[in-house]
Amino acid sequence: MRDQILSLALLLCVLHSACGLYFHISETERKCFIEEVPDETTVIVNYKVELYDPRSNGFMPSSPGIGMHVEVRDSDDKVVLSRVYSSQGRISFTSHTPGEHIICMYSNSTAWFSGAQLRVHLDIQVGEHAIDYANVAQKEKLTELQLRIRQLLDQVEQITKEQNYQRYREERFRHTSESTNSRVLWWSLAQTVVLVCMGFWQMRHLKSFFEAKKLV
């Protein structure tokens, strides 16, 4: 029981975490990230693009003409989202299949030979953590207690989705293992049959050779 409580607490900590980082790319470079997402889960991507200024030797807010093309593909390699956004924005989508979702970003700039550097601030929020509860409380006129209950219910729902996703991964892994074992077995049987046939053919060949030489 204690181990289950510790596991649940650890999972809650993971669910509350978000991915915040920044990275540098050129105006023609493509950068992709892989996010494992359960089905029917909301994902929010916040980003901001800054352009390198050689005069100040730092990064400044990018010009209005520079935007980001964002493309999202699900685990079946189907395009979930693909469009050009401004230099700063908030993107939201809902997963319909569990698994790895690939989020790719690249500048819409056509300055092929400028070599300008861009700094992209990126924050990916998945599941319950992606919900703006302050906005929810204001819209639905919830008290502090009601809002807390709503958060706990969303956390339980997200935990259920995570558990279902883990079972889905285990099932896929088991299917892959069984398929691999089956292929290994059939390959071993095929090798055995080939070796037996080769041995039989060699015995026939040696017998014919000895009979031709009148040794038998």
UniProtKB/Swiss-Prot annotation:
Ranges in the Lumenal compartment? 21-182
Going by the entry's taxonomy, the superkingdom of the source organism is recorded as Eukaryota
The protein's matches in InterPro entries, at most eight in alphabetical order, are given as: Emp24-like (IPR015720), GOLD_dom (IPR009038)
Looking at the UniProt entry, the stretches that span the membrane are: 183-203
Q: Coiled coil located at which positions?
A: 134-164
Q: Where is the signal peptide?
A: 1-20
* Lipid bilayer topology: Single-pass type I membrane protein
Record localization: Endoplasmic reticulum membrane
Q: Which GO terms describe its biological process?
A: dorsal/ventral pattern formation
Pfam families per UniProt: EMP24_GP25L
Cytoplasmic topological intervals: 204-216
The record's similarity note reads: Belongs to the EMP24/GP25L family.
Q: What's this protein's name?
A: Transmembrane emp24 domain-containing protein eca
What species was this sequence derived from?
Drosophila ananassae (Fruit fly)
